[in-house]
Amino acid sequence: MKQQNTGNMAQNAVNPMILGQMRDCINDCLNCHNVCMDRAMGTLAAGKPEHVKVLLDCAEICLATAHSMMRSSQLHGYFCNACQAVCTHCAGICDTMGDRDCANACRTCATSCQQIVKMIS
């Protein structure tokens, strides 16, 4: 992965023009975390451990990404990159489970993270 200019990320993190976008991304990450945690518990009861692992991984990266933005971490761009990739993968898993709400939450989060990465690059 190409190393990003973390100094530029820190400057952009406090730029008033992107604060609203970051707030939206934080909310999307937290929503995706909650949806994936909820689905993981239901999926565990249904006996699909391979799906549970993906849902839990997605929930974890979403929460970590939200926290990195909340504390204005210089590394939040890296978190957003990882979150975008994991959420995209998880959305596909949710599609195979027939869970449109979970897939939509994952895709919304992935899109928000992708927008943050574009803005800070």
Enumerate the language-model features and the residues they cover.
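Amphipathic alpha-helical hairpins
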Residues: 1-121
